[in-house]
C-alpha cells in the first residue's frame, strides 16, 4: 500500500485496519493560501518560561510553541489527529506492517542552505533513539536504511499497525535536523531546521526571536495549515516570543497593543476582553488534562498504600474549582471525552473524597509523618492552586504536605530526577489530544515520569501498554487501553484531576491566527 499525498488515517485513530489517504482531488485543486501582506514584526506573549529548545528531549509545551515553527517532521498530525505526511512525499507500507518505506520531498533545504536528504532523516531518528524523550516509540525498529538520497526505509521487529501513529506524535516530535548535528548532546542541539522560520536568538527568561526563512519551500500538496504541517508560509518578517509569566501583565500588554497575541487568557479576564473590539478570543474546549504524578522512588510515596491514601483523600471539585475559576470538567480517564479510546476503567478510584478511607490506608502503610513535597510553580496558576488545595486536603487526613515552589523550568527539571519531590503538578495537552497509546506513554518505559526504581514501570501496566501498540484491531487496542488505565489508577502512577479549555487571544489586526496545541505563526499576517 502506497500513499503519495496528504492525510493518513490510522486504525488507532479512526477505527480502520489500514492507513488510508484522506485527501480528495478537490482539495488538491483548491486555491492555496497566499499571504495577504508580507512584513511586520509579530510579538506573542507566552505564559511560561521556555526551558530549552532541544525538541528531541523535552515534552514542555513552552518549547513546542517555538520549535514547531522552526522544524519539520517526517510525518505529523492534522487537526483531527490523523497522521499527515510532512517531509515525507509518500510512504509505502508492507501488508504485514513491518516495512515502512518513505520517499523524501525533493528540493527542501535547511536554514544553513544544505539540501535535505534521507541521510539527514536517518541521523535524526538515530539521535532520537539515543536521547529522545519518547525514544521507546522506536524500540520496535529492527533496522533503518537509506538506499538512495530520497528514500528512508524502516524495518520493524514485529508487525506494528500503529507505527505511523507513533512516529507522527508531536508531544516530543522527531524533528528533522542536519546529519552533522546528530551527535549534539542532549539540550545542546543547534537550532537548524527546515521550517518556515529560522532561529535568531534566545535570551533566557526574556524572549526568543525567529525570522522568515527566505528559501523555505511550502508543501504544495496542501492549501493551508494542517496541524503542524500543510501549506505554511512566513508572512511576517520576525516573531518575538516574550515570556510574560504573570497573567495580569500579559493581558494588559495585549490590551495596550504591546503584544499582538497571548497564549493564554485567564478565566477572570475573558469576559472583559470579549467586549473589546480590538481583541479576538479563540477557545479550544478539550485542551488540558490537569494532572499530578508521584515520585515512586522516594519515601513516603514509594509506598503504594501511601499513594492510595493520597488518591482517596483528593476532592477534585475543590481542586479544579481553584485551578480554573470554574472552567473545567471532571474526567475519570486518561482520554478526553469523545475520543476513540475513552474509558472510565478504574474511575471508581477517581475523586473519592473519602477521608476515612485515606486514614485507614495510612494506618496500614506505616506512615509516620514523613514530609510529602508537592512540586509546583507560580507561572501556571492552575498548577500552583491545585497543589495548594491538595496540600490542605492531605493535611486534613494527617499527611505532612508541603509546597515546593520553583520557577517552571526549574520545577520541570527537578521532576526529571529521582529525588527532592513527591508529587509534580503539570498539564498534559498534546499527549491526550493525540489519543491512543500516546496518552499513556509518559507512564511506560523508558520515559516513565513517575520515576520508578531502575527506570522500570509497573510490569502489568507495561504489558497492557505494549498490547495497545501491537493490537491488530481497534477493539483489541481499546480493551488493552482500558486495562492499562485501570492499572494506572490502581497503582497511582498518575492522578488526572480534570479537563480545562484553553482560551487564546490576538489583536483584531492579526489575520490568520488559529488556536492549536502550540502557537502556530505560519500564515499569520498583521494589518497596518
Segment roles from a protein language model:
Residues 96, 111, 155-173, 192-249, ...:
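Aromatic-rich, solvent-exposed beta-strand/loop patch
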Residues 272, 297, 301-339, 385-386, ...:
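Periplasmic-binding protein-like
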Residues 246-247, 359, 363-430, 446, ...:
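Ligand/substrate-recognition segments at binding pockets and active sites
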Residues 43-95, 126, 192:
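N-terminal lobe/hinge region of extracytoplasmic solute-binding protein
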Residues 28-29, 34-37, 136-180, 185-203:
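Surface-exposed binding/hinge segments that line
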Residues 33-35, 305, 351, 397-411, ...:
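Extracytoplasmic/peripheral linker and loop segments enriched in polar/acidic and small residues
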Residues 48-64, 87-89, 114, 136, ...:
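A structural "hinge/loop" feature
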Residues 197, 329-364, 380-383:
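Structural transition elements
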Amino acid at each position: 500500500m502506497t500513499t503519495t499525498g496528504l492525510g493518513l488515517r490510522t486504525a488507532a485513530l479512526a477505527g480502520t485496519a489500514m492507513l488510508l489517504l484522506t485527501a480528495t482531488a478537490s482539495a488538491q485543486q483548491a486555491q492555496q493560501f497566499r499571504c495577504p501582506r508580507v512584513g511586520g514584526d509579530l510579538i506573542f506573549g507566552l505564559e511560561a518560561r521556555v526551558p530549552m529548545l532541544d525538541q528531541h528531549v523535552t515534552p514542555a509545551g513552552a518549547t513546542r510553541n517555538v520549535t514547531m515553527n522552526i522544524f519539520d517532521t517526517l510525518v505529523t498530525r492534522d487537526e483531527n489527529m490523523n497522521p499527515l505526511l510532512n517531509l515525507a512525499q509518500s510512504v509505502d507500507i508492507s501488508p504485514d506492517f513491518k516495512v515502512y518505506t518513505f520517499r523524501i520531498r525533493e528540493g527542501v533545504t535547511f536554514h544553513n542552505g544544505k539540501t535535505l536528504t534521507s541521510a539527514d532523516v536517518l541521523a535524526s531518528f538515530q539521535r532520537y533513539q539515543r536521547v529522545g524523550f519518547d525514544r521507546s516509540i522506536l524500540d520496535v525498529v529492527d533496522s533503518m536504511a537509506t538506499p538512495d538520497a530520497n528514500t528512508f526505509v524502516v524495518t520493524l521487529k514485529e508487525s506494528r499497525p500503529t507505527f505511523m501513529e507513533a512516529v507522527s506524535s508531536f508531544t516530543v516530535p522527531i524533528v528533522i535536523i542536519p546529519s552533522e548535528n546528530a551527535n549534539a548532546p542532549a539540550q545542546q542541539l543547534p537550532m537548524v531546521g527546515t521550517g518556515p522560520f529560522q532561529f535568531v536568538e534566545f535570551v533566557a527568561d526574556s524572549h526568543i526571536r525567529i525570522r522568515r526563512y527566505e528559501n523555505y519551500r511550502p508543501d504544495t500538496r496542501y492549501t493551508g495549515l494542517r496541524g503542524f504541517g500543510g501549506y505554511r508560509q512566513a508572512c511576517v518578517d520576525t516573531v518575538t516570543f516574550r515570556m510574560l509569566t504573570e497573567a495580569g501583565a500579559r493581558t494588559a500588554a495585549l490590551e495596550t497593543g504591546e503584544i499582538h497575541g497571548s497564549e493564554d487568557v485567564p478565566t477572570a479576564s475573558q469576559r472583559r476582553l470579549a467586549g473589546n473590539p480590538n481583541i479576538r478570543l479563540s477557545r479550544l474546549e478539550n485542551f488540558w488534562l490537569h494532572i499530578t504524578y508521584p515520585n515512586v522512588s522516594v519515601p513516603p510515596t514509594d509506598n503504594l498504600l501511601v499513594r492510595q491514601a493520597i488518591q482517596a483523600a483528593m476532592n477534585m471539585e475543590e481542586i479544579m474549582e481553584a485551578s480554573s475559576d470554574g472552567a473545567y470538567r471532571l474526567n475519570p480517564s486518561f482520554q478526553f471525552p469523545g475520543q476513540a479510546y475513552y474509558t472510565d476503567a478504574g474511575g471508581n478510584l477517581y475523586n473519592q473524597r473519602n477521608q476515612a478511607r485515606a486514614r485507614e490506608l495510612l494506618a496500614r502503610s506505616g506512615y509516620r509523618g514523613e514530609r510529602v513535597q508537592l512540586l509546583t510553580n507560580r507561572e501556571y496558576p492552575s498548577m500552583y492552586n491545585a497543589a495548594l488545595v491538595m496540600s490542605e486536603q492531605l493535611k486534613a487526613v494527617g499527611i505532612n504536605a508541603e509546597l515546593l515552589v520553583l520557577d517552571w523550568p526549574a520545577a520541570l527539571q527537578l521532576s526529571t530526577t529521582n529525588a527532592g519531590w513527591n508529587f509534580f503538578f503539570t498539564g498534559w495537552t498534546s499527549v491526550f489530544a493525540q489519543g491512543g497509546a500516546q496518552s499513556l506513554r509518559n507512564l511506560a518505559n523508558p520515559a516513565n515520569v513517575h520515576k520508578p526504581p531502575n527506570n522500570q514501570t509497573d510490569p502489568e501496566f507495561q504489558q497492557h501498554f505494549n498490547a495497545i501498540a501491537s493490537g491488530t484491531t481497534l477493539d483489541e487496542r481499546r480493551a488493552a487501553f482500558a486495562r492499562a488505565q485501570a492499572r494506572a489508577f490502581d497503582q497511582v502512577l498518575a492522578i488526572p484531576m480534570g479537563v480545562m479549555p484553553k482560551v487564546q487571544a490576538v489583536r483584531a489586526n492579526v489575520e490568520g491566527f488559529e488556536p492549536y496545541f502550540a502557537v502556530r505563526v505560519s500564515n499569520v499576517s498583521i494589518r497596518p
